[in-house]
Amino acid sequence: MPTETLKTPVAETNEKGESQDPVYLRIRDLVYQSCGIYHSEEKLYLLVAACKRRMSNLNSVNSGRDYMEVLTNPQKRDVEIRDLLNQITIGETCLFRSQPQLNALHNVILPELANERSKIGLKKLKVWSAGCSTGEEPYTLAMFLMEEKEKLLRDWTFEIQATDLNDNSVEKARPGIYGD
């Protein structure tokens, strides 16, 4: 009587030789559909690590397959995707982080913008800081624009909107209090 050997699917591996369980590819696609963050094959291990951190906080979730069930459960989906996004967003931030960009804003962008808008009587500037993390960049912009208000942008009004996928970071940004 012939014996049949059960074949287990071989999981793919990334450049680091780490297993890429196909369920994590589905989670990657779900994250991408939810917020536009895409983890390439080379960076999938970062998503897997974030999923494992989330799984350690959940009862009865011991595998990627279990976690996928949580992510697709209509009652749990929104909260869990938000919590997963809080794990995968980078959150790198500091005041006056990118001097070359501030120089470009000061030397090129604002003078051109002020000239064009003044011609048509518009003296309002709206800025959106997407991916603001804990808010250092939008506060940098506010300080920068207040300095420009004394020179190039007299009589102008400013509005800065700052957003981030990470709710925890946004909560830290709200008070606008920064230490050394």
Predicted regions and their residues:
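Class I S-adenosyl-L-methionine-dependent methyltransferase module
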Residues: 121-180
